[in-house]
Design a protein with these regions (language model features):
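Residue-level signal for inorganic ion chemistry
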Residues: 29, 53, 117, 149, ...
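Beta-rich strand-turn-strand
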Residues: 106, 328-334
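Well-ordered alpha/beta subsegment
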Residues: 341-343
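Phosphate/pyrophosphate- and phosphate-bearing ligand-binding catalytic cores of soluble enzymes
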Residues: 4-5, 10-17, 151-328
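Short amphipathic alpha-helices in soluble, non-transmembrane regions
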Residues: 36-40, 209-213, 334-339
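Anion-binding (especially nucleotide phosphate/pyrophosphate-binding) glycine-rich loop
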Residues: 2-148, 182-184
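Catalytic cores of large soluble enzymes that bind and process phosphate-bearing ligands
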Residues: 24-28, 86-90, 205, 222, ...
Length: 343
């Protein structure tokens, strides 16, 4: 394992916020994790797991030991007549893993292309885009208990997946939005994911439920697009809407799309018939947060060096630069102001 003291965190968060970690450990294997948990200085200290840094806002220096997950590896672990089972190390860049599966002839993750972050973070957030969520393609994961050092595995039901939710976002005493996970099983701060396995179903079927993808299909003049075509379309759409963090610091889509009951949606539509909304499998209605923010006049506005992206209101951006970056406080002030106005 590689241990760094007073380590800069600006390179490790896509918003480009300046902060430091008192101790940062670059974890490149399961053995590295066990070494951390056996170290007399590191073992008793609080831990904080860091993947790609695309889903965090740093509001100050980090005192817990930062575990920078860099476990690599991509492989097909099983193939049946119904699915491919693919395993990826937690430190693999998510988009690279998606591209690898397609290159190997294992379609199914193409709608999730270009989502920032690492593989290990994907179950934590239950990432999703363009009609597909991680839980739709999830098989199982391996993790290590940070208190005991014991390894364990979880299947989809045990992960308690919900909308951008899982057991990894809840403390042990908190319930999750998932219907199959009992109270007392939250794993936030208690476990670190090392490997994730995906079940990619056969036969493959395209998911084209979103208008942007359907437009691309019509423009291409095809009835049944390939997985590679969908991958390319998703990448084009995301690049048109979302800024490159290397050029303009951001954390991707900052806000969750709110969900309401059908009755609430009917009331909202009566006030504004143009509101963008989508039915959900559980009977609720998802409202487009970006549309709501834009309708409230926030697109393009700023608070200090934190701003709302001109092309996509869901995205907050860093309008500072490396030597005079936005602060986490400015980002959170802007976010709270937007939430207050929308609600």
């Amino acid at each position: 394992m590689v241990v760094e003291k007073n380590a800069p965190l600006q390179p490790w968060n896509t918003f480009g916020i300046v902060a430091r970690a008192q101790t940062l450990v670059r974890v490149r294997s399961v053995a590295d994790l066990h070494a951390v948990l056996a170290d007399p200085e590191l073992a008793p200290a609080p831990k904080w797991v860091l993947g790609g840094g695309s889903n965090i806002i740093l509001t100050g220096d980090v005192k817990p030991v930062v575990l920078k997950m860099e476990i690599k590896g991509l492989r097909l672990v099983q193939e049946t007549d119904r699915a491919w089972i693919v395993e990826a190390g937690a430190g693999e860049v998510w988009h690279d893993a998606v591209a690898w599966t397609l290159a190997q002839g294992f379609p199914g993750l193409e709608n999730l292309a270009l989502i920032p972050g690492t593989v290990g973070a994907s179950p934590v957030q239950n990432i999703g885009a363009y009609g597909v969520e991680l839980q739709d393609r999830f098989a199982s994961l391996d993790a290590i208990d940070l208190a005991t050092g014991q390894s364990f595995s979880l299947d989809a039901a045990q992960c308690g997946f919900g909308y951008r939710d899982s057991v990894f976002k809840h403390a042990p005493s908190e319930p999750t939005d998932g219907s199959s996970m009992p109270r007392g099983m939250g794993l936030a701060g208690r476990a670190v994911i090392t490997h994730v396995r995906f079940r990619l179903p056969k036969p493959w079927k395209p998911v084209l439920g979103y208008l942007d993808l359907e437009r691309r299909r019509i423009e291409a003049g095809v009835d049944q697009p390939t997985a590679q075509q969908i991958f390319d379309w998703v990448c084009d759409i995301r690049r048109a809407k979302l800024p490159d963090p290397a050029v303009l610091g951001n954390a991707g889509s900052f806000f969750k799309n709110p969900t309401v009951t059908p009755e609430q949606c009917t009331d909202i539509i009566a006030r504004d018939p143009k509101i963008v909304h989508y039915p959900m499998p559980d009977g609720s209605i998802k409202l487009a947060a970006g549309w709501l923010i834009d309708a409230c006049g926030w697109k393009g506005k700023s608070v200090g060096k934190a701003g709302v992206y001109e092309k996509e209101a869901l995205v907050l951006v860093n309008r500072g630069h490396s030597q005079d970056s936005v602060t986490g406080g400015e980002v959170m002030t802007l976010a709270k102001a937007i939430q207050t106005r929308v609600y």
